[in-house]
């Protein structure tokens, strides 16, 4: 397979079992430090929720985790993904899928309304904004795009125009774009943001199935309802710092969350799901 082939995936050695390792990570925006001495390790295949209020540093942490910004160079600082400090970002995306709510406006066909769901997912192989005529699309790519749509229970969207889809349908297309590479780990930023209640529940059930099939999930959110039953580890963030890291039963308490959000939080349970008010 040619080195420029978008299906080509750089091999990860079997002993590189850790997905993410952050050591003494500090990030500054201008003169203000927005991440303070973050130390974090996530195993490959582990399901984790990163929970915190708006403005706590979650978005900056995502940028650091995905090599889109770089921490301050200091003694002991390290950012390793699957055991490596240096990655070609195109290759990294084939092991580590990222789905951010802000990407909805950049979804292929969002502005032109001429791209189908299937073409939008195929374009994910090329990290392209649309399926340009000069891109060489193979039968295998089309098969894997359909497979990704099927995993997202969105095969019915294959022929539908992206510009005519609801927010929930577009979210499924975005996730399918990440899944075409069959990544080992998937990061979702505010996965239920801007979705109505039924669409939230449907998406969360689909994400549960991905977790059960073996895709490691990292959910970054400020909604307690986004924390799937499969997620056993929770990381709390506040003021650019890790405020807690441990089993969900220990951290998802009314006392801890009230302190985290600086407001009274009440927790209820609906079958396996948690919700707050």
Regions found by a protein language model. Give the residues of each.
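Catalytic Walker B motif of ABC-type/P-loop ATPase nucleotide-binding domains
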Residues: 186-190
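H-loop/switch region of ABC-family ATPase nucleotide-binding domains
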Residues: 221-222
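Conserved catalytic motifs of ABC-family nucleotide-binding domains
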Residues: 182
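ABC ATPase nucleotide-binding domains
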Residues: 258-277
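Conserved ABC ATPase signature
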Residues: 135-136, 161-165
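Conserved ABC ATPase "signature" region
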Residues: 122, 126, 137-157
């Amino acid at each position: 397979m040619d080195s420029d082939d978008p299906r080509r995936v750089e091999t990860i050695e079997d002993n590189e079992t850790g997905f993410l390792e952050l050591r003494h990570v500090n990030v500054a925006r201008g003169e203000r430090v927005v991440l303070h001495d973050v130390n974090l390790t996530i195993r490959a295949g582990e399901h984790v929720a990163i929970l915190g209020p708006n403005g706590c540093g979650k978005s900056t942490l995502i940028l650091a985790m995905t090599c889109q910004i770089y921490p301050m160079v200091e003694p002991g600082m390290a950012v390793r993904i699957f055991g490596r400090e240096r990655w070609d970002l195109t290759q990294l995306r084939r092991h580590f899928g990222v789905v951010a709510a802000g990407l909805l406006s950049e979804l292929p066909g969002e502005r032109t309304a001429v791209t189908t769901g299937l073409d939008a997912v195929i374009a994910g192989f090329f990290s392209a904004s649309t399926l340009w005529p000069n891109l060489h699309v193979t039968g295998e790519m089309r098969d894997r795009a359909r497979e990704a749509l099927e995993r997202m229970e969105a095969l019915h969207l294959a022929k539908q125009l992206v510009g005519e889809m609801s927010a929930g349908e577009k979210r499924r297309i975005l996730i399918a774009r990440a899944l075409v590479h069959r990544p080992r780990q998937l990061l979702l930023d505010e996965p239920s943001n801007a979705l109505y209640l039924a669409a939230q529940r449907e998406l969360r059930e689909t994400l549960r199935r991905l977790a059960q099939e073996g895709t490691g999930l990292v959910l970054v959110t400020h909604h307690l309802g986004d924390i799937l039953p499969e997620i056993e580890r929770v990381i709390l963030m506040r003021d650019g710092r890790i405020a807690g890291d441990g089993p969900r039963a220990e951290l998802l308490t009314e006392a801890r969350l009230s302190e985290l959000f600086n407001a009274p939080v009440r927790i209820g349970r609906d079958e396996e799901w948690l919700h707050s008010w």
